[in-house]
Amino acid sequence: MSAEIVLAVDGGNSKTDLALVGADGSLLALARGAQSSPHHLGVDGCLLVLERLLDEAVAEAGLARRNGRVAQVAKLMLAGVDFPAEEVALAERVRAEGWAAETSVANDTFAVLRAGTERGWGVAVVCGAGINCVGVAPDGRHARFPALGAITGDWGGGYDVGLAALSSAARSEDGRGPRTTLEGAVPHHFGLRTPTELAEAIHRRRIDVRRVVELAPLVFSEAEDDAVASEIVARLAAEIVALARAALIRLDLHQGPVEVLLGDRKSTRLNSSHRLRSRMPSSA
């Protein structure tokens, strides 16, 4: 049975999808769980999440595991696997688990590129909890970014957008910045009245600061009528374009037509508002 099955994983910083797929493309089982980024959970924590999801998928598909093996091929696309050495190390651990006869590991940005184009090349930008980009040329050359946050020049993931909203709300309240509807909307999201109350709750660890990622959709909603929220969205658009443009130039793909793919709802909403299309190179 394993010779006919592909184990596919799309693991992000907020959720993980694990699928068992037949050789004909039929979906045998799909399990969804928590984040599986080895950067945040460690390799052991990552494997624990995947093992649980695999057990669910195997049960759903009505399969039997023989010596741990489920599939002929395992393709794992995971956030937090940002360097080739990390891909190699995680792939070795997965092979040791014996889930499949053949195993490959890559960053989850490659999943967007593979899902969005049949050509197998182009540029993909993912804007989830963090932000990342990958470019692949027709000859197989890659353009990648470390995507480690501020230390590698990144801005624009859900955490950054949420933190910008929180900061703007606080500055609106105390007069240092322009007035914005975020002043009320941001604390209200957490059941509080003012940005100061929210800041104190975060400071005293009653609210985990990582929850600011929840504010990203709110920023888009407020941006329809609020100048400050709109500026945050515009900055995100500029960062996405900067990533895509850099990948295109590094691969010398800026002369002819190239598919540029956007992953996650935030970047998709940006594209639908034409903020991105007007800023992209003419080749994109």
Regions found by a protein language model. Give the residues of each.
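Short glycine-rich, polar/acidic loop-and-turn segments at beta strand-coil junctions
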Residues: 22, 78-82, 109, 274
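Proline-centered loop/turn at the N-terminus of a beta-strand
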Residues: 73, 102-104, 259
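Short, glycine/charge-rich beta-strand/loop segments that flank catalytic centers
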Residues: 69-77, 107-112
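Phosphate-binding/catalytic loop of phosphoryl-transfer enzymes
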Residues: 81-179
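ATP-binding/phosphotransfer module of carbohydrate and carboxylate kinases, centering on a glycine-rich
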Residues: 1-66, 70-71, 95, 115-121, ...
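Alpha-helical substrate-recognition element adjacent to the catalytic core
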Residues: 45-49, 80-85
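Glycine-rich beta-strand-to-loop/alpha-helix junction loops that act as flexible
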Residues: 75-81, 127-129, 258-267
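Basic polycationic patches enriched in arginine
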Residues: 275-279
